[in-house]
Amino acid sequence: MKGMRSNIPRALNAGAQIACVDNTGAKVVEIISVKKYRGVKNRMPCAGIGDMCVVSVKKGTPEMRKQVLLAVVVRQKQEFRRPDGLHVSFEDNAMVITDEEGIPKGTDIKGPVAREVAERFPKIGTTASIIV
């Protein structure tokens, strides 16, 4: 997993319910915790674009519901700044279900994906139809 070039604000708290935008059968997932999050004692973990999270499937097909999986944040509403000075924000918050290596479990991703995610997880970048 590569480092991020941008300083991404962590806008998604643990407990946030977010749309899943791949074709795995999950529709809404809830963030349980954030992988490699280093915070202060008793602070709730937060996630931003490109962070891998442990999630629980809240809505979706009966086979997918109540499963605990890994997912990567591909879009967030909170604006962030790229090194070239461009400010980027999306219309919604979205995640893609992956495995430990960051390879997506689905074969299709709906909507755009941030360029930072495509750089950090190349397999998500190849699966995405639009990279912003």
From Swiss-Prot:
Superkingdom assignment: Archaea
Any one GO BP annotation for this protein: translation
Annotated function: Binds to 23S rRNA. Forms part of two intersubunit bridges in the 70S ribosome.
Subunit and interaction comment: Part of the 50S ribosomal subunit. Forms a cluster with proteins L3 and L24e, part of which may contact the 16S rRNA in 2 intersubunit bridges.
Recorded family membership: Belongs to the universal ribosomal protein uL14 family.
NCBIfam families tied to this protein: PRK08571.1 (NF006344), uL14_arch (TIGR03673)
Name of the protein: Large ribosomal subunit protein uL14
Organism for this UniProt entry: Methanosarcina acetivorans (strain ATCC 35395 / DSM 2834 / JCM 12185 / C2A)
Gene name tied to this protein: rpl14
